[in-house]
């Protein structure tokens, strides 16, 4: 079934020893509307409810969030306390809290968009047990205010979302993730610790376990095949010709939702202007735009006010939109991990979707320059030369992928 299980635990469907009678199935149906769990979800949830640390590595759209949200409800009902969810993106936590509240689950977030008064109120309510889940960024954990709250509150679980951010070998290393284990060590009682990510190589998995100090975790690695996605690579012959190909593709798929990834902000602006000039409702997203514009573009795309998003890889983690029918890459990504994560935004509803990569030898030079300017981390544990060699190895894998798929026959959706 494509699932590997390490340190498997026995099934635990309820907290019988604590007088807990609410069945897992009833909770699943009542709050989330599902009749059953997917393969892999059950094992992770059983592990959490048995008091075990867990690590879930599951592809985009496989239902990672449910693996901690459902047991959080079960544990809160059993009097175990609140679940802290550590998320790297403000937009992601806002979307998830909104969805949870709409489902009748009491959840809140704390981030820089709130006033000091709102933060104090949220922490007060969490301490009183009014919330099942509390979402925070990793940077929040080390503040005196949050440490004071965590030292007094009853915490059932600490969940680390996008856990690959803890590894320098991953594509989205975030130094603040390295402080999570120290935060957990400061708690008066160690809660269950769960970690989830969509993409992680063996070395990244080892880093997650080691850097989070997971204790003999139940580890689930599901298969990464997405049979509803059709992949192809086409030759990018020249600027104007490629632009016409992209424009014609979007026109052929009028009314469908799509994402176009570009390697540089300059290309994002160029492709975005091309689409808008031709009457296509397109948004743009890159680090050079204001936070307000990025937020507005993401919301407009999420709620189908825009049909196309043109973006750099800054538009990546946590994009919760199920009906994306295509993902185009105007440039080759730096690694297969990046490509899998970005292309994986398509077809999350299980319907057919297409992933097209426009490849040019020029992309190799662009990516080499981007890697040369990549800011090296301050962690002395890994040599900069090792990191550069690893980045180059990943780039070479990406190049081989493009060479192999170039000129392949079109997918059924082109017919």
What are the language-model segments listed below?
Residues 16-57:
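Conserved pre-motif I regulatory segment
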Residues 70-96, 103:
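Conserved SF1/SF2 helicase motif Ia
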Residues 26, 49-50, 55, 62-65, ...:
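Helicase motor core with emphasis on the C-terminal RecA-like subdomain
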Residues 2-5:
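Short terminal hydrophobic/aromatic SLiMs and anchors at protein ends
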Residues 363-405:
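A conserved SF2-helicase RecA2
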Residues 407-415:
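Single conserved hydrophobic/aromatic residue that forms the stacking wall/gate
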